[in-house]
From Swiss-Prot:
GO MF term (any one): structural constituent of ribosome
Protein name: Small ribosomal subunit protein uS9
Family matches, as PROSITE patterns: RIBOSOMAL_S9 (PS00360)
GO aspect biological process, one term: maturation of SSU-rRNA from tricistronic rRNA transcript (SSU-rRNA, 5.8S rRNA, LSU-rRNA)
Keyword terms of this UniProt record: Ribonucleoprotein, Ribosomal protein
Pfam family, one: Ribosomal_S9
InterPro entries: Ribosomal_Su5_D2-typ_SF, Ribosomal_uS9, Ribosomal_uS9_archaeal, Ribosomal_uS9_CS, Ribsml_uS5_D2-typ_fold_subgr
Gene Ontology cellular-component annotations: cytosolic small ribosomal subunit
Similarity field: Belongs to the universal ribosomal protein uS9 family.
Organism: Haloarcula marismortui (strain ATCC 43049 / DSM 3752 / JCM 8966 / VKM B-1809)
């Protein structure tokens, strides 16, 4: 059985394919062990740590990520992988374990950065005003 899922964070979009296999996890066609920085790698593997590690040996996961920055992509991939595992195993206990650990594992974080406006250096900050 093949399961396709997706995850989003800021402008990053990850699409994951979960199928029966022997535990390969690939991010953009390269093994997850080669992902840098290590923090992003740990974040992507979180769903396997919460689910039992024997689950990792039963499935192959392929993730393609585009847009955003390094950590945004890691969060999007993490969500896509977690959703894929839940859909693939069809396990309510696993879903509850993910929700108890961190809701963003299964639910996209819809927050976006506010666009910059004129009259200041950022979205809300204004340029300093001088009276004399």
């Amino acid at each position: 059985m093949v399961t396709n899922t997706s995850g989003k964070k800021k402008t990053a979009v990850a699409r994951a394919t979960v199928r029966e296999g022997e535990g390969r996890v690939r991010i953009d066609s390269q093994p997850v062990e080669l992902v840098d920085p290590e923090l992003a790698q740990l974040k992507m593997l979180e769903p396997f740590r919460i689910a039992e590690d024997d689950l990792r040996g039963e499935v192959d996961v392929e993730v393609s990520v585009e847009g955003g920055g390094v950590m945004g992509q890691a969060d999007a991939a993490r969500t896509a992988i977690a959703r894929g595992l839940v859909d693939h195993t069809n396990d309510a206990e696993l879903r509850d374990a993910f929700m108890e650990f961190d809701r963003s594992l299964l639910v996209n974080d819809v927050r976006q950065s506010e666009p910059k406006k004129w009259g200041g250096p950022g979205a809300r900050a204004r340029y300093q005003k001088s009276y004399r």
